[in-house]
Amino acid sequence: MKLPIYLDYSATCPVDPRVAEKMVQYMTMDGTFGNPASRSHRYGWQAEEAVDTAREQIAALLNADPREIVFTSGATESDNLAIKGVAHFYNKQGKHIITSKTEHKAVLDTMRQLEREGFEVTYLDPESNGLIDLAKLEAAMRDDTILVSIMHVNNEIGVVQDIAAIGELCRSRKVVFHVDAAQSAGKVAIDVQEMKVDLISLSAHKAYGPKGIGALYVRRKPRIRLEAQMHGGGHERGFRSGTLPTHQIVGMGEAFRIAKEELQQDYDHALKLRNRLLDGIKDMEAVTINGDLDQRVPHNLNVSFAFVEGESLLMALKDLAVSSGSACTSASLEPSYVLRALGLNDELAHSSIRFSFGRFTTEAEIDYAIELIRVAVDKLRAMSPLWDMYKDGVDLNTVEWAHH
């Protein structure tokens, strides 16, 4: 067993060996290394052909038209292009946007930037299970609302939003609907026709592809217009200039092809591992599972261990590669804004750990993880005076702490 055990698939996945093997064929003199935009010779044509194939593979996972796929450097860029692109193109129709407080930072910080430019953003509170209440979303809509941006699967707690219902609502109100699907592509089925989504952000490295490549799905019927954020040679139908990195695109295409073929298999494997981990820790005292347990992807389990400091637990679990919060914000010691939005207090939010697993995780690794978690939590609680008070029946919420 390789230590530390990797249980942080929500941060990134290892590249599938089949993907890596394919990518290597598009880099050297022996392979297809040409520029897909070179129209005057075979090197360019072959590279363009490889890009077209990848576009088809990515579109197939979404039930989309390959012409609706725009390549970007990743989901962060896709979020920026979608949100700023719509805001700047449709600002004559209105300047109001709706999103939720539990979105990824790539969405929230893009919204903050638009607020500085004079747009008005409504941030919806999720319910305590992490899901968005449709009635609240509808109530927030106004005549000048031009865009709704809601993620499909949350990166910290793994809950799955009812995208089809939100899409139906947005379509009936003629509001553009953007979805960040970085954490759902390859984990749950996505059908852009059924879901009535206008824009979808995708990432390769959350689906066993390489880092540094992503895509934005841009609907053609009804056509969605965007203002480009990256200017240059007019690549990607003018939406996103820059030479296409053939090897990365081929990697993303192959990763999405495998994801489509093995979707059910991957899902069942993750579910088996999730249930095994849950069964191994659910009899522990004062343990909370964060987020809805039914409407969620099985690849993620976010757990709060009361009376244990999250950072200490991470250190005690040095043989497990896990995270508290998401990799994008874990450099800060602030408690997770996602968990705070669910109504968790600071202490509980601070004591949460995200376990995320995937294609290459084994049952033996989960069993070893359970053993380590139980020992570490018991050891840390044994050192905590708060745990003693809790065990003695003291309601810690009623204690008035002296500030000094």
Curated annotation (Swiss-Prot):
Q: Got a GO cellular component term for this one?
A: L-cysteine desulfurase complex
| Name of the encoding gene | iscS
Its recorded reaction(s) are: (sulfur carrier)-H + L-cysteine = (sulfur carrier)-SH + L-alanine
Q: Which family does it belong to?
A: Belongs to the class-V pyridoxal-phosphate-dependent aminotransferase family. NifS/IscS subfamily.
What this protein needs as a cofactor is: pyridoxal 5'-phosphate
What name has this protein been given in UniProt? Cysteine desulfurase IscS
Q: What class of enzyme is it?
A: transferase
Question: Which SUPFAM superfamilies does this one have?
Answer: PLP-dependent transferases (SSF53383)
Annotated [2Fe-2S] cluster binding sites: 328
Q: What is its EC number?
A: 2.8.1.7
UniProt keywords (A-Z) are: 2Fe-2S, Cytoplasm, Iron, Iron-sulfur, Metal-binding, Pyridoxal phosphate, Transferase
Q: Which GO terms describe its biological process?
A: [2Fe-2S] cluster assembly
Look up the record and name the pathway of this protein.
Cofactor biosynthesis; iron-sulfur cluster biosynthesis
